């Protein structure tokens, strides 16, 4: 995951 905010919900390439 690129950012902690994104990783809370889903592992996205980069938000």
UniProtKB/Swiss-Prot annotation:
Expressed by the venom duct. Keywords: Acetylcholine receptor inhibiting toxin, Amidation, Disulfide bond, Neurotoxin, Postsynaptic neurotoxin, Secreted, Toxin. Has a free C-terminus. It is found in: Secreted. One of its GO terms (molecular function) is acetylcholine receptor inhibitor activity. The keyword Secreted applies. It comes from the Eukaryota. Disulfide bonds join 1-15, 2-11, 6-14. Slowly and reversibly inhibits human nicotinic acetylcholine receptors (nAChR) alpha-7/CHRNA7 (IC(50)=45.7 uM). It is unknown whether it inhibits nAChRs by a competitive or a non-competitive mechanism. Belongs to the conotoxin M superfamily. The cysteine framework is III (CC-C-C-CC). Has low or no effect on human alpha-3-beta-2/CHRNA3-CHRNB2 and alpha-7-beta-2/CHRNA7-CHRNB2 nAChR. This is Conotoxin ArchIIIA.
């Amino acid at each position: 995951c690129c950012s902690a905010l994104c990783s809370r919900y889903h592992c996205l390439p980069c938000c």
